[in-house]
Amino acid sequence: MRLFSWHKQLKNNFKKGKTGIFLFSFLIMLLSATQVKAQDPEFSQFYANPIYLNPAFTGTSALPRAIMNYRNQWPKQGNTYATYNLSVDKFVNSTTGGIGFKLMYDRQLNGVINTINGSFIYAEHFNVSDRFFFSMALETGFIYKQFNVSGLIFPGMIDQGNGVISGTYPIPLEEGHKLIPDFSFGSVAQFDEGYFGFALHHLTQPDLAIYNGDQSGKLPLKLTLHAGAKSHDYHNDLFSKEFTISPNLVYQQQGAFKQINGGVYLKEDWLTLGLWYRNNLSARPNSLIAMFGYQSDKFQFGYSFDFSLSNTAAYSYGSHEISMTFFFGEFHRRLFSNTMVIPQM
């Protein structure tokens, strides 16, 4: 969960004489910065961003794939919180495992805080039987965090007569940045058409504090637990002969933040519909997530919208998320069956 920023409305508030809103706005911004340091960006389309959810999904698709994800959180406040993700992975027959690459860019408070996370992943696949296999993965990479003061606005910089922003910062501020290594581990397993796994991100709990004395810069270990299944119903009276229902559960914990997500997917031929409920156990708001997806042999598209169920709905207007997956090459028989049956989104 991220706290929203009012800084886009600051100019109008000062023109109306609401100087007190600045103190609240600046407090919210500082709290948001602390939250960013303590928690990773989140995506609602968990399985449309599988390597982000769990690195052990690397190389578990039938074909090499490239996935692009975009999330605009709380769009009514402008493009205040935006996250972009790119991942590429493939199965390698010679190693009986998968290799992958992931690059994530997260922009907070319209560019005041920026984070880039890049990593390489290797996943080893183990074929236990015709009905059961599992994967274990190690992810190594870096995190780059930047603090950009050019996005900050203070009341002394705003002309209360015409709202023009000018002047200098009333307190000394310096831009800063930090680059540190990062490591994660994950494992997934599949038995028939049920799947489950766990992931541990930020094993070393890296210190992202940009300034000396900042005690809130430590990035806590993130635990992810997930499970799901697919059931098939064959019929002759709808679009295709096969209708799929897939219930899923995802639990995540990072520091004091705890969240549980439960949802179900309905798939009919090229169409996928999904509905999830998100419950933030340690903080609010909760939300309802509606999803729509299209799928063909070489392309998948997903769109989702988070409906906030809390008092912040009037200010945030939910969150938009888009995913696109591209598959490459031709299918070749593998050394063993290790394609995951996870949902499209």
Predicted regions and their residues:
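Subset of outer-membrane beta-barrel
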Residues: 39-345
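Bacterial Sec-dependent N-terminal signal peptides
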Residues: 1-42, 264, 292, 326-332, ...
